Regions:
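N-terminal cationic leader/targeting segments used for protein routing and processing
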Residues: 8-10
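Cationic, low-complexity basic patches in intrinsically disordered or flexible, solvent-exposed regions
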Residues: 3
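Alpha/propeptide regions of enzymes that mature by internal proteolysis
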Residues: 12-189
Length: 189
């Protein structure tokens, strides 16, 4: 693998992180946000739940695109898939209609179904009209194959992990110092 210009990798050093922190200069016409993170966009909240134990290294990330009810206040969106094999859920409708109507969940490849079920239940609880006076909901779940790092066959991501990530995002949002405190409170509840 070729190294990023201006950065020499030493033995055991990990160059993952933000591209510019690794010496990679990306040229574009837009200015980066203050922290160069998704949470620089006003209203976006993000939280994750990590599951680790021996060979288990996986988790769930929840992205709330705004503070309101996403099903009732849909957002214009698009998708571009790179190196994808069609295992994410909700992308086809997103491309067809050009909007998202749920929070976005990211998890491992074999946990997409579990995450979609949890996200659908979350949306049904918030919107009693889904499937009654409106259409159904399009849960948006993306994935990454973490099988090299994780016992992916163990199907360790459960509905409660998705629920916890959503709750953490709602309660802490972009305040990552507060995120750890909220996570501890939820675990002890």
């Amino acid at each position: 693998m070729e190294q990023a210009p201006g950065k020499v990798k030493s033995e055991g050093e990990n160059l993952m992180g933000l591209p510019r922190d690794c010496g990679l200069e990306l040229h574009h016409k837009w200015k980066s946000g203050k922290l160069n993170k998704i949470t620089d966009v006003n209203g976006i909240k993000v939280a994750n739940v990590t599951i680790q134990d021996n060979e288990i290294n996986t988790g769930v990330t929840a992205i709330l695109p705004h503070e309101g009810n996403v099903f009732k206040s849909k957002l214009v969106a698009g998708a571009s898939v790179l190196n994808g094999f069609g295992k994410s859920l909700g992308i086809v409708q997103l491309k067809e209609l050009g909007n998202i109507e749920t929070p976005i969940i990211m998890t491992n490849t074999l946990s997409v179904g579990e995450a979609a079920t949890a996200l659908t239940k979350y949306c049904l609880e918030q919107n009693e009209d889904i499937g009654v006076t409106t259409g159904t909901v399009n849960p948006l779940v993306t994935e990454c194959n973490d099988g090299m790092l994780n016992d992916i066959r163990g199907l360790h991501v459960k509905e409660e992990h998705v629920r916890e990530a959503l709750k953490l995002a709602e309660e802490s949002g972009t305040d990552f110092d507060k995120l750890a405190q909220v996570a501890e409170t939820i675990k002890n509840a």
